[in-house]
Amino acid sequence: MLIGLFPELDAPGGVQRAGRHLAAVLTEFAGSRGLECRILSLNDKAELKRLNVTGRDIVFTGSERAKGNFLAAALKTARRAAAKGKKAPKLVVAGHPNLAPVVRAMRLITPRLKTIVCTHGVEVWQPLPRVRRNALQKADLVLAPSRYTAEHVSADQGVDSGKVRVLPWALDPQFEALAVHAAKSALPARFPQGQVVLTVGRWRADERYKGMDTLITALPRLLPRWPELQLVAVGDGDDRAWLEDLAEETGVDRHVHFLSGLSYAELAACYGHCEFFALPSRGEGFGLVYLEAMACGKPVIGGAHGGAPEVIEDGKTGYVVPHGDAAQLATAMETLLDDATLRAEMGRRGKQRVENEFKFSVFAKSFRRMLRELCES
């Protein structure tokens, strides 16, 4: 029996998208071996739900943020797995380290249960609370989307490095299909005219590490040469008003545009019509938005921190700059704005890199190999 535990599946966000990809491969792997598969979600609605992910249907049950109900469902599923017999494969995949204690409790009921816990980035760059850290250490495998995060899993969480594996997240296949025609797709009505720099994220006060404020403060260095330059920020959050005030104080409010509530096709069109993408963050464990921009053939500017330098090849597919350094960010932006040939070449290299290393098929093959390894051990 294969079991998947996830914080949330039917919602936007990088953690949610990675969870859907994990659940899709887990479901497909179980089906290929004639095994029962049960998927549980903490935050989704308390109902049986079906989602089509990468052409595969995943069926899961939510707990509507009721932690007690989620734990009870997980333990009930563990008892069901225990009843399958000694020889039947039993494996649970947790899509976030916060769920590691639940996995540990399930293993007390089903000692033969193999366990995988997935990490994402900033949440494991500092020591976790003791209970979570101890539970993470007991997992058979701990997955990280970048070498940087994998190193923190060992150094800060005390997980044996032999149990830590790097599994980069993948470009969503639905977005991959949209990226093919992104440059010709219809734009949202509020997308501005002129040369556009695009950024995408959640603009929350507790996530100012994304670097949106630095993008705003870099604009005055660029506008004298490119007076029609526009910064489009896709996404929303409780920090949007603060960022809008910052743009006004900086004197660039006419050049900063927030777009939210876009469809996937409209998002792809935004990528397709920008000059380049920029998110100078210091807290990306991987950075799925970088993959989306690269898939649309666009150069990328990211932060020289976290997992971003493992996605962006500095000087080849874009640039990485220190977080908070508006001068270095402006220099990288100037270099790209100055040279259309360079933008095209970097975009071509980035698109090829996604094709070779970050397609869903590459992710699925690697994850299936890990599942097979544990099921057969």
Tell what function each PLM region has:
Residues 328, 335, 342-356, 363-366:
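A short, well-ordered alpha-helix in the C-terminal region of glycosyltransferases
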Residues 241-262:
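Nucleotide-activated donor-binding/catalytic signature segment of Leloir-type glycosyltransferases, i.e.
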Residues 314-315, 319-326, 335-341:
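Conserved acidic donor-binding segment of nucleotide-sugar-dependent glycosyltransferases
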Residues 299-302, 312:
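Short hydrophobic beta-strand element within catalytic cores of glycosyltransferases
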Residues 148, 170:
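Carbohydrate-associated surface elements
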Residues 282:
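Aromatic "clamp/platform" in nucleotide-sugar-dependent glycosyltransferases that forms part
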Residues 190-210, 216-219:
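Conserved donor-binding/catalytic core segment of Leloir-type glycosyltransferases
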Residues 136, 261-262, 269-274:
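Short alpha-helical donor nucleotide-sugar binding micro-motif in glycosyltransferases
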